[in-house]
Amino acid sequence: NKIISAHCEVNDLLKGGYIHDGVYCKEHGHKGICSKSEWAQIERDCKLAEKTGCRYHVCHISTKESVDIIRKAKARGVKVTCETGPHYLTMCDEDLQEDGRFKMNPPLRSREDMNALIEGVKDGTIDVIATDHAPHSKEEKSKGLKGSAMGVVGLETAFGVLNTKLVKTGIISLEKLIDMMSVKPREIFDISGGKIEVGAPADLALLDIDKEWCVDPEKFVTMGRATPFQDWKLQGENLLTIYKGEIVYEAL
């Protein structure tokens, strides 16, 4: 009863693209990645999961079609779960700049896609919000949209971004955000812990949900510092991280 987890991408449809095949792509002479390269595999895989009865998890969805396909599959009883990332819920291709910190895979999609993802979070179609944390060196991310490596960091900004843009605006509750970032991943992937009780592993984070801070990559603890959220003013910061009973991060 193991789960199958997939990064969905049809290679034949990529055609050398590296950002979303939208208005920005065309106006600036870039090669685009079409939405179908993602949702076509999800559509196929959901049919296979329905036929076989297997558990299927879709990583970092980014398109409105993906949300719709998964929503309909769940309604049919398919054992499918999915996730998206903070950047797909708070940015779109209108926010792109000629900078490697805006390059990730899947790419930032259209505003319509972003809004569909938000609806998917609200109605429960999307189960998990994960960082898709992909650290790269400064050199690897210094070659613009075309030449930079795919992927951005997210560990140090995820809660602040989502708390600011989804919770403080009333789109979802704090409890739902915690569930999507912490509880649901544990349940889906059969990870022990995640409970505050005697004898349970002490894996905890202490968060100040109202603390205001500005995203400064130079202050990141991690080596990867390519973030599209640079200079964003956020509410909600991690003050303490305990892993297996040991304090591994402290900013009290």
Stretch-by-stretch model annotation:
Residues 65, 112, 180, 190-191, ...:
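Short, conserved clusters of charged catalytic residues that mark active-site
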Residues 1-129:
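Histidine/acidic residue-rich metal-binding segments in metalloenzymes
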Residues 27-55, 120-123, 127-129, 134-209:
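His/Asp/Glu-enriched, well-ordered alpha-helical/loop segment
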Residues 85, 100, 104, 141, ...:
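Glycine-rich, flexible loop/turn motifs
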Residues 14-15, 31, 62, 90, ...:
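Generic, ordered loop/turn and secondary-structure boundary motif
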Residues 9, 62, 85, 134, ...:
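Anionic group-transfer/hydrolysis microenvironments
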Residues 144-147, 201-252:
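C-terminal cap of metal-dependent C-N hydrolases
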Residues 14, 67, 90, 137-139, ...:
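Glycine/Thr-rich phosphate-binding loops of Rossmann-like dinucleotide-binding domains
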